[in-house]
Amino acid sequence: MNKIAIYPGTFDPITNGHVDLVERALNIFDEIVVAVSTAYGKNTLFDIRIREQMIKEVFKDNQRVKVVSFQGLLVDTAVKHNACAIVRGLRAVSDFDYEFQMSSVNNKLNSDIQTIFLTPSEKFSCISSTLVRAVAIHNYKRVDEFVPECVFREIKLKYSKE
C-alpha cells in the first residue's frame, strides 16, 4: 500500500520553497497530492485553473506528484485521495500557531490523518508567495530566482501588460 500525503495551499504562486518541500516530502511518502485551494475569501493573483496548470507543469516529469484543486474541508479531500497525512511547511515560529490550530482541528475532524510539519531548506526559508507577489508588483523581473521558470513566465505575462 502506498503512503500518500496531501500538501494543501493556495500556491498563489507556487514558489521554489513549495517545490523543495514536495521533493523532500517524497523522501517520506510514496506520493504527494498537491491540493490547490480555491482560496475562499482571498484575492488571488492567479485564478485556480492557472495555479493548478503551473503546478502541473512544474511536476510534469514526476509520476509521484498529483495535482488537484479543492474547495471545502481539507480532511475530506485527503480522504478522497487516500492520504494518510497532511504535509505543512513551517518557515518561522510565527507559522507555528496557525498551523498548530489547523492541525488540531483537522485531527478532531479525522483522527486517522496525521499532520507532518517540515521546515524549509535554508536557502528557501524566507520565500513565500506573499513575498513573490509583493516584489512582482514593483519589479516582476526580480522574482525569477524565487519561482520555477513556468511560474516566472506567467508573472511576466501578467505584469508586463500593466
Curated annotation (Swiss-Prot):
Protein keywords: ATP-binding, Coenzyme A biosynthesis, Cytoplasm, Magnesium, Nucleotide-binding, Nucleotidyltransferase, Transferase
EC number(s) on file: 2.7.7.3
Keyword Ligase belongs to the record: no
Cited SUPFAM superfamilies: Nucleotidylyl transferase (SSF52374)
Residues that, per the record, bind ATP: 10-11, 18, 89-91, 99, 124-130
GO BP annotation list: coenzyme A biosynthetic process
Principal localisation: cytoplasm
Site feature (Transition state stabilizer) residues: 18
Molecular function terms, GO-annotated: ATP binding; pantetheine-phosphate adenylyltransferase activity
Catalytic reaction annotation: (R)-4'-phosphopantetheine + ATP + H(+) = 3'-dephospho-CoA + diphosphate
Localization, UniProt: Cytoplasm
Nucleus found in the keyword field: no
Superkingdom of origin organism: Bacteria
Pathway terms, separated by semicolons: Cofactor biosynthesis; coenzyme A biosynthesis; CoA from (R)-pantothenate: step 4/5
Positions annotated to bind substrate: 10, 42, 74, 88
Enzyme class, broadest EC rank: transferase
Cofactor(s) required for function per UniProt: Mg(2+)
GO CC field: cytoplasm
Self-association state and partner proteins as the record states: Homohexamer.
Family membership: Belongs to the bacterial CoaD family.
Purpose of the protein: Reversibly transfers an adenylyl group from ATP to 4'-phosphopantetheine, yielding dephospho-CoA (dPCoA) and pyrophosphate.
Name used for this protein in its record: Phosphopantetheine adenylyltransferase
Lineage: Bacteria, Pseudomonadati, Pseudomonadota, Gammaproteobacteria, Thiotrichales
